[in-house]
């Protein structure tokens, strides 16, 4: 299956699945459209919306809730299981090293096959149809959302912020909220643990005052999802987009040297001013609270606006779950499971519960082999990439379905002695957006070992035997069920 070409093709795909509704009456991006999109998701309706008339922005359209269903996302990416996407990168790392010439050639072929996911430079892009610069280039052209009444302004809520890493030269493409602060200024909120902030810090250390940058709005589903993924540094985000898409991403070089997806709807070209640091917020984020950071953030200065004919603006809305970002979080959970299993082979499965707001809570099942294995897994997970920002982690045995919260609750209730099995890690780094920490970015973590205990962990005793029905009686009841007249 060829990857879906762009946002427009993806909307057509959604419409073919009866997952798209069109709104032909005029609607405003200031509070009104965000309220509509939230209401749809809170009702459990689960469909995308295309607003064909946008108040104050003639010629623009707005798409929202485009990631409304994990299964539809899977179909759009053409895979039977979302884990396949992660396996494309990490499966070649598993298994014994090849010894014979045949095995070595196969291994080389697997490595070389990654080349098909590399970005492909092209000389044409649809967004070059319209180029505005000088006085004409303005954030006011863009139908950016004001999501909540007390937000600090209008926000680009799903712009793919492009900056090149100053050390390795790889491309970062992250979803960082951008508060519009003027005609040509936007404040870029990248959190301290993210790759964008790393690029800022490295650039400052090198004595640079600005970073060439681009804000990309609207692309194919695989590329849009990649922007929100916690891709480990220094993997190039354009390369990872190719892995998600199943084919290399076509990219176009802007005058400032930044390569951007050629299928973009809107491109805002400019630079990050590292010396112009400003306040940002408040903004109503995915925890369901207004976030007003205490630190300052760099300013994006707009130089050019590029856009396709009748461009489609895509923006997400945030707030208490479940909203569209829940699907994006579940997508990350699935595609990074193979990576977690490569580093921690004992891991069987993982679940980030929707109301755990991504990094609030995780359930992980493991195949336990020795005393203390549950705590070993907890400590490893607490130090693993973006999972290290997770506040509460519960580890259970391999036979517990982590996607069934009732099974997890049963495991915690029946397997946990709080003094023995609860681990509190104080004075650690935390999610910068967590409203519960007394000091931003610095708090504590909770680990719960809800595995069955081995004798060494249980005072030398054997763990109690679990109840199980008599097999012969089960067969008897199954055979006579119709006689009982119960259903």
Curated annotation (Swiss-Prot):
It comes from the Archaea. InterPro entries: UbiD, UbiD-like_C, UbiD-like_N, UbiD_Rift_dom. One of its GO terms (cellular component) is cytoplasm. SUPFAM superfamilies: FMN-binding split barrel, UbiD C-terminal domain-like. GO terms for molecular function: carboxy-lyase activity. Belongs to the UbiD family. NCBIfam families: UbiD family decarboxylase. This is Uncharacterized protein APE_1571.1. It comes from Aeropyrum pernix (strain ATCC 700893 / DSM 11879 / JCM 9820 / NBRC 100138 / K1).
